[in-house]
A protein has these predicted regions:
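A eukaryote-biased signal for short, well-structured alpha-helical docking elements
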Residues: 1-4
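A composition-driven signal for long, intrinsically disordered, charge-rich low-complexity tracts
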Residues: 7-8, 81
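A short N-terminal beta-strand-loop micro-motif at the entrance of redox/enzyme domains
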Residues: 9-38, 42-45, 49
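Glycine-rich beta-strand-centered segment in the early N-terminal region that forms part
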Residues: 24-39, 52-116
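Short, solvent-exposed secondary-structure boundary/capping segments
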Residues: 45-47, 97, 121-122
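Active-site region of chymotrypsin-like
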Residues: 74, 133-136
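Short, compositionally biased
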Residues: 111-134
Length: 136
């Protein structure tokens, strides 16, 4: 499955791009989530406007390969609150088909590394999120 990503230029928020990527093999311990629906509100504009100062751009960093070169510091993915469905799982505590509500990128899919999994919640334990606020 391909994934589509809505990118925003960090220094010029009205400059945007759509980029597609083929799905990579999912490593052990990760899940792939299809972002089904998300809300676009004034909060999202705040996330973009204060992305550097408040570290919002760091939640879903742009891979250099997504832009065909190292422009990853120039572009970002605005975080959104929404609903997703697990389409692939290599994690023993998360089943394919589970529905999730949470903090996602403006992308059609996202790969997560579930930690602190319980009956009603999980956190993304991706290394780049280790220093970021846990509520997101």
């Amino acid at each position: 499955m391909n994934s589509t990503h809505f990118l925003v230029r960090k220094d010029q928020l009205s400059t945007t791009a759509l980029r597609g990527t083929p799905a990579a093999a999912l490593p052990d311990g990760q899940i792939r989530v299809r972002v089904d629906k998300f809300a676009l509100t004034s909060n999202n504009i705040t996330y973009a406007a204060f992305g550097e100062a408040m570290a919002y751009w760091q939640f879903f960093p742009v891979s250099p390969t997504l832009l065909g070169g190292d422009q990853s510091n120039t572009w970002g993915r605005i975080p959104v609150w929404g609903f997703g469905s697990v389409t692939e799982s290599h994690h023993p505590e998360v089943a394919v088909g589970e529905r999730l509500y949470g903090y996602f990128p403006m992308s059609s899919t996202v790969d997560l590394t579930p930690t602190r999994v319980s009956a009603g919640a999980l956190s993304d334990g991706a290394p780049h999120r280790a220093e970021l606020h846990a509520v997101y």
